[in-house]
Amino acid sequence: MGAVLRSLLACSFCVLLRAAPLLLYANRRDLRLVDATNGKENATIVVGGLEDAAAVDFVFSHGLIYWSDVSEEAIKRTEFNKTESVQNVVVSGLLSPDGLACDWLGEKLYWTDSETNRIEVSNLDGSLRKVLFWQELDQPRAIALDPSSGFMYWTDWGEVPKIERAGMDGSSRFIIINSEIYWPNGLTLDYEEQKLYWADAKLNFIHKSNLDGTNRQAVVKGSLPHPFALTLFEDILYWTDWSTHSILACNKYTGEGLREIHSDIFSPMDIHAFSQQRQPNATNPCGIDNGGCSHLCLMSPVKPFYQCACPTGVKLLENGKTCKDGATELLLLARRTDLRRISLDTPDFTDIVLQLEDIRHAIAIDYDPVEGYIYWTDDEVRAIRRSFIDGSGSQFVVTAQIAHPDGIAVDWVARNLYWTDTGTDRIEVTRLNGTMRKILISEDLEEPRAIVLDPMVGYMYWTDWGEIPKIERAALDGSDRVVLVNTSLGWPNGLALDYDEGKIYWGDAKTDKIEVMNTDGTGRRVLVEDKIPHIFGFTLLGDYVYWTDWQRRSIERVHKRSAEREVIIDQLPDLMGLKATNVHRVIGSNPCAEENGGCSHLCLYRPQGLRCACPIGFELISDMKTCIVPEAFLLFSRRADIRRISLETNNNNVAIPLTGVKEASALDFDVTDNRIYWTDISLKTISRAFMNGSALEHVVEFGLDYPEGMAVDWLGKNLYWADTGTNRIEVSKLDGQHRQVLVWKDLDSPRALALDPAEGFMYWTEWGGKPKIDRAAMDGSERTTLVPNVGRANGLTIDYAKRRLYWTDLDTNLIESSNMLGLNREVIADDLPHPFGLTQYQDYIYWTDWSRRSIERANKTSGQNRTIIQGHLDYVMDILVFHSSRQSGWNECASSNGHCSHLCLAVPVGGFVCGCPAHYSLNADNRTCSAPTTFLLFSQKSAINRMVIDEQQSPDIILPIHSLRNVRAIDYDPLDKQLYWIDSRQNMIRKAQEDGSQGFTVVVSSVPSQNLEIQPYDLSIDIYSRYIYWTCEATNVINVTRLDGRSVGVVLKGEQDRPRAVVVNPEKGYMYFTNLQERSPKIERAALDGTEREVLFFSGLSKPIALALDSRLGKLFWADSDLRRIESSDLSGANRIVLEDSNILQPVGLTVFENWLYWIDKQQQMIEKIDMTGREGRTKVQARIAQLSDIHAVKELNLQEYRQHPCAQDNGGCSHICLVKGDGTTRCSCPMHLVLLQDELSCGEPPTCSPQQFTCFTGEIDCIPVAWRCDGFTECEDHSDELNCPVCSESQFQCASGQCIDGALRCNGDANCQDKSDEKNCEVLCLIDQFRCANGQCIGKHKKCDHNVDCSDKSDELDCYPTEEPAPQATNTVGSVIGVIVTIFVSGTVYFICQRMLCPRMKGDGETMTNDYVVHGPASVPLGYVPHPSSLSGSLPGMSRGKSMISSLSIMGGSSGPPYDRAHVTGASSSSSSSTKGTYFPAILNPPPSPATERSHYTMEFGYSSNSPSTHRSYSYRPYSYRHFAPPTTPCSTDVCDSDYAPSRRMTSVATAKGYTSDLNYDSEPVPPPPTPRSQYLSAEENYESCPPSPYTERSYSHHLYPPPPSPCTDSS
């Protein structure tokens, strides 16, 4: 490229001789040079591979070419004589740099930005950037410079189009053209003639004037389609035209000689005459020593013809030459994906983007004036970060255990960092480098947000926008907490301190006020309460309070005394927190400033003085300054929390920061993993977390009642627990997986539990009728009673060194001990008021006493040396010592889990055995396990249980399936091993694996497209076709749905039907269902497609509520809840007998399992069974099971038999329903809304015949006229048009063909029957004044021979003599017309005969129709049936599967209209993208003049982009914007939507603010955070459906990510 440019540069020196320049122009994808004298030749590409080059200019003397790229939001340059030398000049803070101009004398770069509405200047390398103009600009575009005079010129095509002039230093601004101007695009200067030229793309002219705007003249007008950019060389004007895609030229004086220079340009943009002549030399006042300026020296039109200037935001000193060393006061701004700084020293308030990467969701921001770091929180990255004020030195400060950090505050004195977390509901502190972290407050916080510090006094203040909004204060160590304000608050988002006046200010986004009070909570008053719809970020500096507003997308400030307001920045979306600060000034001090107050870790200042504090896991020793890691400490649970106490320092107890603890009971730990485990008898869970409170999770959530005892197997990594309510001892892995019941027989209220994994034993206490202490191997075997004569023993603990057991006795108030066999029993301590928990460490035992509310210690052998460790503790439930010595030893399970696939359980003999999850069986290898294949499932209201009939197994367990609300019915797919159930609360059908994984909604609760709400009642699975048959209580139909959730359709529906219980027999192709019709309940059978319907029983029934089927024995069973009995019959309905009718109260479910019939009795809370062979009678299976709802037996699937079923492979080839016929072959069928096509495999839409047509049942002829129905001729191939023809009524005449006509039409002279039989055998006598036609018809005599045919047989015009002159001979035209008429008549007659008689019989086999249909089953139109035309096409039962897609037989059986609607039979589907419904194209004021480019102006694909350098905006060059459109959406704000806004995916109308559309469409990115009330990350995990205390926006951590709601809450649809 360099060689080409050098040659072109050399050629340019020939310009003076040739009087024609090289033209440099931007072509969007490249920059090109073309010879103006030979423009027809190809242009030379100067720079290629560009995104969207718009403006271009050059500095000829330096060999530099500059251009702006609006897609990359950058200004770049290249050098003539270097290859691939593209350099970035300006890459930040640009949005749409439309205009560009080079000052070749002062060596400066000027540009316009039509998005930011600024004109800026910088050095040629992009340094020392300064905003010259930022006010009264509205779409500035072209810019031209006259350095010799110090003036600059630019066009503005905004609402008030104009051309302005100003000094190049920003002075002497003046409008020179503001009339007869609309879209001023191109602009150029004639330096020799001192003229200004411009092009207007709307008014289609090129005008010129003097440089001051006077003496305006037209150069070219009327013949310019769309001029864009303009340049001049000598006497010739050159310009680009968007419409013609060319470069044109004319004489600059007269406009004559208009010609095309260069054509076929992809997208001609800016243009310049590339010549030294266009950049004449002149005196440069800045040429010597930069004019004495420290930074920028700008040309000026007034003496001394230059002006010193400073970069944006920096003040010029009084000497007029030197700039300050950066800004003094800054406003730091956090946006969603970038950070910005705004200087408060200068009036332009230009926002400068910090060059930082990977900002995902910045929220809060603060500043440390000592080291110059900015600190901010990122909600998506879940981290706290920092960088220097220029964006360099970026670091992550805190990354662990961060959920939603909404507030941040720097203690610049003690060098600490504080933050609030509304996810963990904590206030924490750490050093500024992220070390030495400590939780200060974790209780009674709902939604903490803003936080500010007063290090001089020692207080911190924060807001909480929870259910009871408040502003609180505490010392910097978290002590002395007090509520300052808790009334008349909504969403207190922002908080700021006035250190000088002792005031605290806050902004409330719900009450829309800014208020102030004294720091002690007194003197509250309102400062601002007008036009602040959604305040968020908040700060104070000097006399001003600053805030961000989400809805107004603005930053404003108000004077704290006068309340005068000023807008700092406007229309900037995604605004979050902000901080106003003095960059270098540090105020105040406290004792922590000197050597960290002498503290080894944290120095926290309080009003009473400093306090040294330790991070989590450390403890303060007696000097109260030094923190150490303790060797051992006590852990204890106290119902609402879990705490720790050092054994070395006897310091105060410290709560472990755990959320959601309701009633902690048993407690243990895993020392190698540094985790604690605890049971919660209120939540009925077992949970775990790290010692610092992080990573809290529930490991066991199902099937617990009162888990009072729990212990960790630290060698096998297993968890054991004893449940007093279920009377079981269970085990699982530490994460809750592979759960198994070890002991369940003869357990009576098991309580305390202790493990000895090294020896393979477990020990427990029982509190039942005969309290005792038992022992068993850790697999539950070898059970024995060690201590039989004991009271309610608790706190069971083991001294592993001395091999002794210790326990407290709640009945005798003793602490006792024995050896590991229960012998050598001793009393260690007596005279104890109420001992409860107990543990042992080294030479001491530690116990809790409920009466003394204390933790005490004594010698473990003598009970002497009693000491109170801690007092004032209520109801300490459990206690233990956290130390490695308490978890020592080894067994084989400690190595690779003993090579067991699931559980490794230590035993005393043999070392270990492999164990399996409940109901699994150990394989022959004694290592691996197999899942059960035969079992029972039964459901309760909010649980599904599995039961096996095995004496060696615990009978039932609860399956770990989440979110069960109201289980009504269950079924199981043995092939995929998935469980299906109906949730009657959510009205849906769901499925999941037995372990709760792979949850999926199969049938949703509504069908929006059909406006249907459903209520599934019962379900049954066809495992061969992979279908679910289910009844619906709302629509009273039987539906079929594929197991993957795709609908098949309705197979059974009737006007009086109320199908409820259903069971399928796919082996025979039938289904059985109860039909609870009013006054006549029935049990019916039908084929799986709903045909062959048959009532089996209609008598002796009251409310048959449950069905079961035994295909092996060929038996059907049902339970009648009203008659309270269970009956059976053959599958055909024969041999009906009553199986059981005694002591049955409320049977709700039946199933067959082997030779037994099982049922559940909801009222008796019982599962029972009866032997179907009659040999063993009735047996109770299990009792005391509340809220039973259904039961289902799962039998082992024989894969060989399964594969032999004809429907098992690809559904038998059927597209929809596969049925087995009696001979073992298959028959395909369809749901009711479809019919079977000719291939007898596929289902399709039935023919959409009009209401005036009859639908043939099958065959290639679909529709015939209704009049042909029952006319005696068979037009349909299957003769269905002549089947079941009605008998005529008494008032009708029946034609010979069977057709019925009105009796009055008989013998009226007109043949009304198709066979004319109504006019046969008629005896007619005409009156005297009448003429009798040959067919017997009577007409008036005056109508005889009147040249009008009145008799239907035309006999009235026969035998007539002429009475008039003969008509003239017909012309050829008349003859032609007659010929055409005759031809049409003959053709019609032939067509009629063919259609009626011949064609239907002659159609060949090879012909095809659109759809071919085959219907199985007889036509069954009753005699006497007279079809309505609107129902003829779809109501014939012989076509019971016939219905259009939009017919009344919807998938859920709803009724919405006639079976066939011709209006809907069009080529566009309901989802057609061509539909324009709802599309709104707003009126455009001053619309864009550009031609239709690649981008639709209505889709607005371009848009606002964050200015982060890491962001790439891919919109194309946007020449003109739409004006007067609504601003971009913002998170749902206040006022309009405080109560009932719901998030919507709808986008506002196309009328969005220019450039902001991309903010509405960032589907792949999260929407701006709330941090505002009631966002989706509410720490209470509540689900608010209305517009919350805050924009219901961003916290979409599950899922899906929606754009923020419009603001205010409008519906733009």
Swiss-Prot record:
Cross-link (Glycyl lysine isopeptide (Lys-Gly) (interchain with G-Cter in ubiquitin)): 1403
Beta-propeller 1: annotated segments: 20-275
This protein's UniProt keywords: Cell membrane, Developmental protein, Disease variant, Disulfide bond, EGF-like domain, Endocytosis, Endoplasmic reticulum, Glycoprotein, Isopeptide bond, Lipoprotein, Membrane, Palmitate, Phosphoprotein, Receptor, Repeat, Signal, Transmembrane, Transmembrane helix, Ubl conjugation, Wnt signaling pathway
Resulting phenotype, residue 1399 to A: Some reduction of palmitoylation, and little change in plasma membrane location in the presence of MESD nor in Wnt-signaling activity
Domain LDL-receptor class A positions: 1248-1286, 1287-1323, 1325-1361
Residue numbers bearing the Phosphothreonine modification: 1479, 1493
GO biological process: canonical Wnt signaling pathway; cell-cell adhesion; cellular response to cholesterol; chemical synaptic transmission; dopaminergic neuron differentiation; endocytosis; midbrain dopaminergic neuron differentiation; negative regulation of smooth muscle cell apoptotic process
Free-text comment on this protein's domains from its UniProt entry: The YWTD-EGF-like domains 1 and 2 are required for the interaction with Wnt-frizzled complex. The YWTD-EGF-like domains 3 and 4 are required for the interaction with DKK1. The PPPSP motifs play a central role in signal transduction by being phosphorylated, leading to activate the Wnt signaling pathway.
Protein name: Low-density lipoprotein receptor-related protein 6
Organism per entry: Homo sapiens (Human)
